[in-house]
Curated annotation (Swiss-Prot):
One of its GO terms (cellular component) is cytoplasm. Pfam families: Queuosine_synth (PF02547). One of its GO terms (biological process) is tRNA wobble guanine modification. The gene is queA. GO terms for molecular function: S-adenosylmethionine:tRNA ribosyltransferase-isomerase activity. Belongs to the QueA family. It is found in: Cytoplasm. Pathway: tRNA modification; tRNA-queuosine biosynthesis. The lineage of its organism: Bacteria, Pseudomonadati, Bacteroidota, Flavobacteriia, Flavobacteriales. It catalyses: 7-aminomethyl-7-carbaguanosine(34) in tRNA + S-adenosyl-L-methionine = epoxyqueuosine(34) in tRNA + adenine + L-methionine + 2 H(+). This is S-adenosylmethionine:tRNA ribosyltransferase-isomerase.
Length: 349
């Protein structure tokens, strides 16, 4: 399939700038691939589609406050630094994106905090906007990380055209987030409230947690018409034996195995055995899922509504079937569903 197959026009007013008042009260589109049907529900109705022994696969990555604002030495020009990943904890080396990139060069010092309590030096250019920074900080590693947390902002996506609020620190995070390392939330999971998870647990639904630290590469636009030539950025992935046991037992019993979000789906599709079971894994994945693709583990998924031409939309097309996905998106726009990170959800059966 070609890139142009994944383009559509989205009215601006359908882009969610704020989350639903309550997590589980966003809307839910339910797509049945067997029956070729589309239904409109509320997210809390998701409980009606799961029974004893079914499995929900959750990505327990935790978003850290990755966006820093500071000033450049001498000129005092305001700059933005987006922390991507830590390269070396002892040397305080980080892979970052900078803005405005043309003004931030090797050797420059950058100052953060009202009292310039954190300083970084640019030591390398990695891409047009990418830099390697060495943070100059005298305290312990723990104090340094606390300082980053204190000065950093919740990295809500740029298309949300408003200032970050204190509420974002809580709402741009799943309630089961544990392992810090993501610069973007696994957004399908944002819809689960404690109450809803408890009700699913009481019903006998099992939860398998995986960790995929979502990077900004997930949202990189695809710029090649031939999808097979697109390269995904690598993201850190951990799948434990415990998670594999829960998933494989459910699979053996022919239960519903539901990937909560594209990140959970990419995680499990990155570590499949020759017998089509889930294997433990610790490392990196740059798996790109686009049509046609045979899914080995999950037979069901929950996801948000994605941007045109995105790799996330391509995965949904591969799982849902392209024609049914197009029909669902057309209906979502007609019915006024909210799109993107803080938007509504779909359940694909």
């Amino acid at each position: 399939m070609k890139l142009s197959h994944f383009n559509f026009n989205l009215p601006k007013e359908l882009l969610a700038e704020f989350p639903a008042e309550n997590r589980d009260e966003s809307r839910l589109m339910v797509i049945d691939r067997q029956k070729n049907t589309i239904e409109h529900k509320m997210f809390k109705d998701v409980i009606n589609y799961f029974d004893d022994g079914d499995v929900l696969i959750l990505n327990n990555t935790k978003v850290f406050p990755a966006r820093l604002y500071g000033n450049k030495e001498k000129t005092g020009a305001r700059i933005e630094v987006f922390l991507l990943r830590e390269l070396n904890s002892e040397q305080r080396l980080w892979d970052v994106l900078v803005d405005p990139a043309r003004k931030i060069r090797i050797g420059n010092k950058l100052y953060f905090g009202d009292d310039d309590s954190l300083v970084a030096e640019v030591i390398d250019n990695t891409t047009s906007r990418g830099r390697t920074l060495r943070f100059l900080y005298d305290g312990s590693y723990e104090e340094f990380r606390n300082k980053l947390t204190e000065l950093g902002e919740t990295p809500i996506p740029k298309y949300i055209n408003r200032d970050v609020t204190p509420e974002d620190a809580e709402r741009y995070q799943t309630i089961y987030a544990k392992e810090e390392g993501a610069v973007a939330a696994p957004t399908a999971g944002l819809h689960f409230s404690k109450h809803l998870l408890k009700k699913l647990e009481i019903k006998g639904v099992n939860f398998a947690e995986v960790t995929l630290h979502v990077g900004l590469g997930t949202f990189n636009p695809v710029e090649v018409e031939d999808l097979s030539k697109h390269k995904m950025d690598s993201e850190e992935l951990i799948i434990t034996q415990e998670a594999c046991d829960i998933v494989n037992e459910g699979k053996a019993k022919k239960k519903r195995i539901c990937a909560v979000g594209t990140t959970s789906m990419r995680a499990i599709e990155s570590s499949v055995s020759s017998a089509n079971t889930l294997n433990p894994y610790e490392g990196w994945t740059n798996k790109f899922i686009f049509p046609p693709h045979d899914f080995s583990i999950a037979n069901c998924m929950i996801t948000n509504f994605h941007t045109p031409k995105s790799t996330l939309l391509m995965m949904i097309s591969a799982f849902c079937g392209h024609d049914l996905m197009k029909k669902a998106y057309e209906e979502a726009i007609k019915e006024g569903y909210k799109f993107y990170s803080y938007g509504d959800a779909m359940l694909i059966l």
